[in-house]
Amino acid sequence: MSVKAKRHLLVGPASLWKMKQDFQIKFLKENGLLPTHKFIDIGCGTLRGGIPLINYLNTANYYGIDVREEALNEGKKGLEEEGLIARDPNLILFEDFRVLDLGVKFDVMFAFSVLFHLEDSIAKSCFEFIARHISDDGVFYANVNDKTQSEGKWLEFPVVYRGVEFYNELAKDNNLTMKTICTLKELGHISNDDRGDLQVMLEFRKDC
């Protein structure tokens, strides 16, 4: 197993890390991400998706937040290996969305394979965080499990299945509008596992 594959085991299957990395930056660029944008990666983990984004965005425009120090430390090793320290990404370890204030308004906010690892109360706090930090013309993208299946655990996190209406209500509570884009498979995410490929990508914007 390669060093990168072993590192990214902290965020998903070793065999899929490159596909998922490529998928994220491709999706974001196709949906308007520019180097000049302020961008936040919610649940950035080991920077599986973050490395190419840090390379693409202007210096210091990438923000990555995570609750796991081990994952962030592995991400920092990846930055060194890729020669990206000078890109000055903002990597932030935190414990609670309710007290996290970055003092930045983001053009693009992204949570890839994160929301379905949050209990309902934490998901609520996450959306409040998003509402505080999204710019007037900003956008938040997130993929979710909207099919009913048996819930379980992944590492120390729950795996929850909630209909998109749950997220629509959170959006309304925070003056955001929600749009369902399509399944990840339709966007080019091909893992040959319907649990991932049939997840739905959602888009949220300020309700102006």
For each predicted feature, which ranges?
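Short catalytic micro-motifs in class I SAM-dependent methyltransferases
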Residues: S113-V114
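Class I (Rossmann-like) S-adenosyl-L-methionine-dependent methyltransferase catalytic domain
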Residues: M1-N31, T46-D101, L118-S125, F129, ...
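Active-site charged/polar residues at nucleotide-handling catalytic sites that mediate phosphoryl
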Residues: V104
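A conserved beta-strand element that flanks and buttresses the S-adenosyl-L-methionine
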Residues: F110
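Conserved acidic residues
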Residues: D107
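Short glycine-centered segments of the SAM/dcSAM-binding site in methyltransferase folds
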Residues: K38, D137-V139
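Conserved class I S-adenosyl-L-methionine
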Residues: T36-G45
